Swiss-Prot record:
Belongs to the BLCAP family. Its main location: cytoplasm. One of its GO terms (cellular component) is membrane. It comes from the Eukaryota. It is a multi-pass membrane protein. This is Apoptosis inducing factor BLCAP B. Coiled coil: none annotated. Keywords: Cytoplasm, Membrane, Nucleus, Transmembrane, Transmembrane helix, Tumor suppressor. The chain crosses the membrane at residues 19-39, 43-63. Acts as a tumor suppressor; induces growth arrest at G(1)/S checkpoint and apoptosis via RB1-dependent and p53/TP53- and NF-kappa-B-independent mechanisms. Modulates expression of genes involved in the regulation of proliferation, cell cycle and apoptosis. It is found in: Cytoplasm; Nucleus; Membrane.
Length: 87
């Protein structure tokens, strides 16, 4: 499970507060994961463990999924601050 040390930190990268940056963040993360899987070719067990963890995080809709924003979860308080959104 040596290859998991390069995949698990990806789940800890936070989404940006600005909703306008969510799409570019998800595209970047998707391309990063695709290029990592094609270049490093992790073992099947590591890939399944990572995809299972990613599925559970996105399915639970806690707001940590980088692929999309759940409609049921609310935006953070800082997202309504014009000083943060304007940056």
């Amino acid at each position: 499970m040596y290859c998991l040390q390069w995949l698990l930190p990806v789940l800890l990268i936070p989404k940006p507060l600005n909703p306008a940056l969510w799409f570019s963040h998800s595209v970047f993360m998707g391309f990063y994961l695709l290029s990592f899987l094609l270049e490093r070719k992790p073992c099947t067990i590591c890939a399944l463990v990572f995809l299972g963890a990613l599925f559970l995080i996105c399915y639970s809709c806690w707001g940590n999924c980088f692929l999309y924003h759940c409609s049921a979860s609310e935006l953070p308080e800082a997202a309504y601050d014009p000083a943060v959104v304007g940056t």
